[in-house]
C-alpha cells in the first residue's frame, strides 16, 4: 500500500537520511542559483528563484519516477582507452565543463571591473530558469541514483526531494543576498563552483573524490572569510 511505510521505523530513517542527503548535495546548487539570479533585474530575482527551484523539483521527481531509465544511465555506451563511458559519465563531463566555463567567466567579469561587468549584467529570465533546471539535473543525478539504492519506496524518495527543495527555497534568498553584498564571498563561491566542476569531470572518468573533503574545504574557507568579515566590520578601514 502507498502509505504502509508510515508505521515502519526504517522508512522514517530512510526519509531522514535521503532528505539530509538532498539538502547537503543541494548546497552547490544554491550557490550556482544565487550567482545566476544575481544577473537578473532585482524585481525578477525572487520569481526566478521560485520558478527555477520548482522546475528543478519537477525534474528530480520525473527522474525518480523513471527509476528504470535512471539506473540504465550507468550502463557503458562505448569504450575509450579501456575506459567504459556511460550516459552518466557524459552528463557529468559536460556539466563539469559548463560549471568551469561559467564560473571562470564570472570571475573574469569581476576582475575586469564594474564597467565591463555591466555589459553582461542583465541576463535573460528564461535563460536563467533553464540554467538553474539543467544544472540541478546534473547536481542531483548522483543523489537520485543513490536514493534508488537507499530506499525501495518511491513515495519516500519523492517526499525527501520535496522537503529538500522547500528548505532550499527558504535559504536561497538569504544566501543570494549575502553573496551579492560581499564580493569576496562571491569570489569564494565562484572558486568553489570551479572545484565542483573539476570534481564532476573526475567523476565522469570514475575517479571518485570523497564529497566530505570538498565540503570540509568549502566550510573551512567560509569560516575563515566570516572571521575576515567580522574583523572588517569591527575595524573598518
Swiss-Prot record:
The keyword Protein transport does not apply. It is found in: Cell inner membrane. Keywords: Cell inner membrane, Cell membrane, Membrane, Transmembrane, Transmembrane helix. This is UPF0053 inner membrane protein YgdQ. It is a multi-pass membrane protein. Residues 39-50, 101-124, 173-186, 231-237 are cytoplasmic. The keyword Transmembrane helix applies. Its main location: membrane. One of its GO terms (cellular component) is plasma membrane. Belongs to the UPF0053 family. The chain crosses the membrane at residues 18-38, 51-71, 80-100, 125-145, 152-172, 187-207, 210-230. InterPro entries: Integral_membrane_TerC. Pfam families: TerC.
Amino acid at each position: 500500500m502507498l502509505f504502509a511505510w508510515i508505521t515502519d521505523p526504517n522508512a522514517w530513517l530512510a526519509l531522514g537520511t535521503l532528505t539530509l542527503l538532498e539538502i547537503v548535495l543541494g548546497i552547490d546548487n544554491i550557490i550556482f542559483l544565487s550567482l545566476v539570479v544575481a544577473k537578473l533585474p532585482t524585481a525578477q530575482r525572487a520569481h526566478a528563484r521560485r520558478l527555477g527551484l520548482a522546475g528543478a523539483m519537477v525534474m528530480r521527481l520525473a527522474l525518480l519516477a523513471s527509476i528504470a531509465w535512471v539506473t540504465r544511465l550507468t550502463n557503458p555506451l562505448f569504450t575509450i582507452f579501456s575506459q567504459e563511458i556511460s550516459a552518466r559519465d557524459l552528463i557529468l563531463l559536460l556539466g563539469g565543463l559548463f560549471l568551469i566555463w561559467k564560473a571562470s567567466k564570472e570571475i573574469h567579469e569581476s576582475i575586469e571591473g564594474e564597467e565591463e561587468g555591466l555589459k553582461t549584467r542583465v541576463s535573460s529570465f528564461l535563460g536563467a530558469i533553464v540554467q538553474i533546471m539543467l544544472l540541478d539535473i546534473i547536481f542531483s543525478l548522483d543523489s537520485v541514483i543513490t536514493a534508488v539504492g537507499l530506499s525501495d519506496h518511491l513515495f519516500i524518495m519523492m517526499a525527501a526531494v520535496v522537503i529538500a527543495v522547500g528548505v532550499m527555497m527558504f535559504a536561497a534568498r538569504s544566501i543570494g543576498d549575502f553573496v551579492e553584498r560581499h564580493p569576496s564571498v562571491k569570489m569564494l563561491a565562484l572558486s568553489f563552483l570551479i572545484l565542483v566542476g573539476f570534481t564532476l569531470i573526475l567523476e565522469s572518468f570514475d575517479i571518485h573524490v570523497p564529497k566530505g573533503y570538498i565540503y570540509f574545504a568549502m566550510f573551512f574557507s567560509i569560516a575563515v572569510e566570516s572571521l575576515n568579515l567580522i574583523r572588517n566590520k569591527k575595524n573598518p578601514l
